[in-house]
Amino acid sequence: FSEPFLSRNHTEIMLKNVGANIKKNENEISISNNSQKLDPLNITVPSDPSTAAFFAGAVAIIPKSNLIINNILTNPTRFGFFTSLKEMGLELDLLSEKSEAGELVSDIFIKHGELKAIEINEEQVPSLIDEIPMLAVIATQAVGKTIIRGARELRVKESDRIESIIFNLKNMGALIEEFEDGFSITGPTKLNGVIIKTFGDHRIAMAFMIASLVASGTTKLDNYECVNISFPEF
């Protein structure tokens, strides 16, 4: 089978490591019948980059802050958000990258920097699709116009995330323009505390909890329990 752009490849990596006959050629993957039994594999599950993105997002918008995140997955198909943070002006260093069962894992150091706007295109979207709500919040504090296109998949997540992002950022005072497949945000802008409409979406709730760290006044969520879907301890 094939895919238009490179997407998450955890399944392919795991199958290869247990002895499956799997081959990859650019964006095409083929699996041949293998009469051999697959080999057992010990796996230490690394820290999830989509969850870590919220803490990294806090560093991005809070001056003079820094953070070390331990044992985080750095697989390039999942690391687009962190690559974008570096492009926006943050200092980001991999401290001890290694391979765990075929997956790249590292401690990372992140330090706040002066934020500048970036553009995200369709080819980049798969590597940061779940982190776009947090990236949108960060973009409100960046100098210039951040543009995200090719993210139509956000329309069919736990909520229509394009609508959810735009609704809440506009309420907070951000300058944001909607596209069918994304949006643009012009910054930096001062955010105001409001009641956040989460649309029952855990990533919207967590992204705007981080936004509240730099918003004036009080920010409340209309539904906090939805974060239990992915991060009950958040």
Predicted feature locations:
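Short, structured segments at the rim of ligand-binding sites
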Residues: 1-234
